[in-house]
Amino acid sequence: MVNFNQFLKQAQSMQKKMQEAQEQMANARYTGKAGGGLVEIIITGKGEVAKISIDESLLKSEEKEMLEDLIKVAFNDAKQKCDEDSQNSLSGALNGMSLPPGFKMPF
């Protein structure tokens, strides 16, 4: 059986690692590109759009629909990178944490 004091120390360590991972994620930036770089979106680790860059060649009215699609693709690309990094950071924070039998984390 796991010593309760040892478990509490592990939980405190995990909490600290989780806070560090969350701070790291909040400061991270992820770039999504579409159309070979014609559209570029940078998002924060919180999934908020920080910047959008659009090549001038796409600013013609006949390119409107394509531009809308490229913005969507670029955002989804950046969001996927953010989600993957977030998952990896949180997994790393939990690494080495041994939980007592039957104890489940809420995520």
Curated annotation (Swiss-Prot):
It comes from Rickettsia akari (strain Hartford). SUPFAM superfamilies: YbaB-like. Disulfide bonds: none annotated. It holds the Pfam family YbaB_DNA_bd. This is Nucleoid-associated protein A1C_06705. Belongs to the YbaB/EbfC family. PANTHER family: NUCLEOID-ASSOCIATED PROTEIN YBAB (PTHR33449:SF1). Binds to DNA and alters its conformation. May be involved in regulation of gene expression, nucleoid organization and DNA protection. GO terms for molecular function: DNA binding. It is found in: Cytoplasm, Nucleoid. Homodimer. GO terms for cellular component: bacterial nucleoid; cytosol. HAMAP family: DNA_YbaB_EbfC. Keywords: Cytoplasm, DNA-binding.
